[in-house]
Curated annotation (Swiss-Prot):
SUPFAM superfamilies: PCD-like. This is Putative pterin-4-alpha-carbinolamine dehydratase. InterPro entries: PCD_sf (IPR036428), Pterin-4-alpha-carb_dehyd (IPR050376), Pterin_deHydtase (IPR001533). Belongs to the pterin-4-alpha-carbinolamine dehydratase family. CDD domains: PCD_DCoH_subfamily_a (cd00913). Its EC number is 4.2.1.96. GO terms for molecular function: 4-alpha-hydroxytetrahydrobiopterin dehydratase activity.
Amino acid sequence: MTQLENKHCVPCEGTAAPMASEELQRQLSSLPEWTLVDDSGTSKLVRVFTFKDFQSALDFTNRVGQLAEAEGHHPALLTEWGKVTVSWWTHAIGGIHLNDVIMATKTEKLV
C-alpha cells in the first residue's frame, strides 16, 4: 500500500476540481483491483469484493460503513450474496478527489 492509508479525508468544497487524469492514473497504479467507471458523466472508483457467503459480505459492508463514518466520506455500497460493490466519488464535485483514493486505499485494508 501507499502512504495514503495513513492520510485522512479533508472537507471538499464544491469549488474543488476533480483529480486530473494523469494524477488519477498514477494513483490507480497502487490500486490495481479498482476500476475507473464513467457513470453518466461522473467518474467513480469501483471495486467488487467477493466473499464466501452473505454474512461475510455484510460484515465487510459494516466495516466500510464504520470507516466512512470515521472519515466523514461515504461510498455507495451494494451488498449481495457473496459480494459487495464499493463505489467512491465525491458528490460535491461530481468526480474523483484525493479523498476517494484515500478511502479506496483504506477499504483495501478491511478485507
